C-alpha cells in the first residue's frame, strides 16, 4: 500500500483546551470546503489513474551533489572531496546535501509524479565509533530552514549505505542531513573539521513504483469494468462509509455517474467523479450519529478514538452481534494491542505534552556543548514512551508525578548517566536511590520545553504545569 500524510493538504483543525479533537470546536469555512474538494480530487486522480505510470531511473554521484553553498569547500559545513560529498554538521542551513540532474546546474532534482520511489544510497561514516543517523527531508536545499523531515535512517557502524522507499508527490525536492552530527556546522575555511562526518558517493532514484496493475485499490473500487451507475455508487459508498446511503442521497450520486457515462467518459473517469463527490460530502467528512448511539456507531466512535481510523471487520462484527454493547472491554484490549493504537498514543501525547515543540529552539550550543542533535530528538520521545509503557502494562498514571524508573534509549541513558541501553528502542531503566529523574517534570524534554535556549524559566514551567497537568 501507499502511505501518505494528507494533513498538509488541509487546514489545521481548531484547537480547544490544547486538543484538536473537540467536536464543539469544529468549524467548516468556505476555505475548508474548497480544501476538502481539492484533496478529494488529489486522492481520486491517484487512486484511479487512466494509465500505468512510467517507472524511471535516475543516477547521481558526487558531481551532481550540492550543499549549503555550491562547491562549499571552505565555505560551509559540507564540501566535495574527490568522489564523495561530505556532511559535518546537523543544522541543515550549515550542512545539507541535495542534488541536480545536470552537474553544472544548481537546479535541484524535482519528483515528476506522485507515487512510491526507491532510494538506493551509498554512504558511510568517517571517524565514527558508533552508528549514525541520516535525515531525509523535503525542501529546497538552498532554503533549508523550511525543511520538512520525513524519515530518519539509522546506519549501523560500518554500514556502506541504505535503501528505503518513500511516498512522494509531484514537485517534491529531497535533501539529506547528518542528524547525529556532534556539531551544528560551521565555516571550514579557517578551521577544518576533524570529527565524525558522513560521506555520500552515489544515489539511485527509481519510481514511481507499481507492484501490480491494476493496483489493489483499483480492483477494490472497480472489481469489474462494466459496472452500472447504481453498482458503482453503492460500491464506493460502502468502501468509504461502511453503511448504505439513503435513497435520496444515493440518487444524487447516481446522477453524477450517469452524466459521466452519457458524456462518454471511461469507467475510471466516472469512478473518479463519484469518489470526489463522496469524499467531499457530509457522509464522509462528518461522522453522523443517532441521538442514542447504536452499536455500530459505538464501534466507529471507539475506533476513531483508539486507532484514528475506521473500525475493522472484527469490531464491526462485535457491534452487529450485540457483543460490543454488552461488554466492550475485550475489544478495547484487543485494539490497544494492535499497532494502529500507536496513532492514538502519538496524537494524544503530542497534544497533551506538546512533544512537537520540544525542539522548537536551542539548546544554545555555545552553552550546552555536549548536547547532540539526536539526544534532543530522544528527549521529545520520552514522554510518549512513558505513556505507552503505562498503558501497555496497565500501570498507575501516578508514575507521571513520580516514578522509580525512566524510559530511555541508548542516547538518553548516556545523557542521564544511567546504565547502558542498547539501541534506539526505549526500555524501562531503574533509577538509583534518591534520584530526582522520576516523573514527567524531571524529564529532559519537559525541562527543555519549559526553558529558553540557554536558561531555565520557572514561571513558564509553573504555568505549563497548571494548564496541562492540573487543569
Residue locations for each model-derived region?
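Low-complexity, glycine/serine/threonine/alanine-rich intrinsically disordered linker
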Residues: 1-471
Amino acid at each position: 500500500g501507499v502511505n501518505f500524510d494528507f494533513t498538509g493538504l488541509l487546514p489545521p483543525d481548531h484547537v480547544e483546551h490544547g486538543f484538536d479533537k473537540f467536536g464543539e470546536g469544529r468549524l467548516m469555512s468556505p476555505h475548508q470546503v474548497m480544501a476538502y474538494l481539492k484533496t478529494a480530487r488529489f486522492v481520486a486522480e491517484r487512486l484511479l489513474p487512466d494509465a500505468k505510470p512510467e517507472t524511471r531511473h535516475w543516477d547521481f554521484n558526487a558531481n551532481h551533489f550540492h550543499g549549503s553553498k555550491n562547491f562549499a569547500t571552505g565555505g560551509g559545513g559540507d564540501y566535495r572531496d574527490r568522489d564523495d560529498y561530505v556532511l559535518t554538521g546537523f543544522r541543515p542551513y550549515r550542512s545539507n546535501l541535495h542534488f541536480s540532474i545536470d552537474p553544472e546546474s544548481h537546479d535541484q532534482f524535482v519528483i515528476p509524479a506522485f507515487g512510491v520511489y526507491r532510494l538506493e544510497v551509498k554512504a558511510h561514516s568517517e571517524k565514527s565509533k558508533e552508528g549514525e543517523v541520516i535525515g531525509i527531508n523535503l525542501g529546497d536545499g538552498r532554503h533549508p530552514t523550511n525543511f520538512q523531515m520525513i524519515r530518519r535512517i539509522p546506519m549501523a557502524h560500518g554500514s556502506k549505505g541504505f535503501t528505503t522507499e518513500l511516498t512522494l508527490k509531484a514537485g517534491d525536492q529531497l535533501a539529506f542531513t547528518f542528524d547525529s552530527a556532534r556539531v551544528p556546522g560551521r565555516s571550514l575555511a579557517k578551521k577544518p573539521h576533524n570529527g565524525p562526518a558522513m560521506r555520500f558517493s552515489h544515489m539511485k532514484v527509481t519510481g514511481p513504483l507499481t507492484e501490480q496493475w491494476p493496483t489493489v485499490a483499483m480492483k477494490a473500487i472497480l472489481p469489474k469494468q462494466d459496472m452500472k451507475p447504481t453498482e458503482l455508487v453503492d460500491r464506493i459508498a460502502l468502501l468509504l462509509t461502511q453503511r448504505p446511503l439513503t435513497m435520496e442521497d444515493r440518487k444524487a450520486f447516481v446522477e453524477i455517474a450517469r452524466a459521466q457515462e452519457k458524456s462518454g467518459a471511461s469507467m475510471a473517469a466516472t469512478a473518479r467523479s463519484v469518489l470526489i463527490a463522496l469524499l467531499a460530502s457530509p457522509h464522509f467528512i462528518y461522522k453522523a450519529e443517532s441521538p442514542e448511539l447504536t452499536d455500530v456507531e459505538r464501534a466507529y466512535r471507539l475506533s476513531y478514538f483508539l486507532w484514528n481510523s475506521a473500525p475493522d471487520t472484527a469490531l464491526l462484527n462485535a457491534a452487529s452481534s450485540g457483543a460490543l454493547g454488552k461488554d466492550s472491554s475485550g475489544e478495547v484490549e484487543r485494539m490497544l494491542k494492535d499497532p494502529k493504537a500507536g496513532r492514538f498514543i502519538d496524537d494524544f501525547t503530542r497534544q497533551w505534552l506538546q512533544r512537537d515543540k520540544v525542539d522548537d529552539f536551542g539548546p544554545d550550543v555555545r552553552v550546552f556543548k555536549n548536547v547532540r542533535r539526536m539526544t534532543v530528538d530522544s528527549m521529545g520521545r520520552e514522554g510518549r514512551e512513558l505513556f505507552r509503557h503505562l498503558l501497555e502494562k496497565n500501570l498507575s498514571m501516578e508514575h507521571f508525578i513520580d516514578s522509580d524508573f525512566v524510559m530511555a534509549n541508548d542516547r538518553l541513558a548516556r545523557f542521564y548517566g544511567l546504565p547502558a541501553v542498547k539501541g534506539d528502542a526505549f526500555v524501562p531503566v531503574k533509577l538509583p536511590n534518591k534520584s530526582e529523574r522520576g516523573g514527567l517534570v524531571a524529564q529532559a524534554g519537559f525541562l527543555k520545553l519549559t526553558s529558553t535556549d540557554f536558561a531555565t524559566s520557572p514561571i513558564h514551567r509553573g504555568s505549563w504545569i497548571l494548564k496541562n497537568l492540573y487543569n
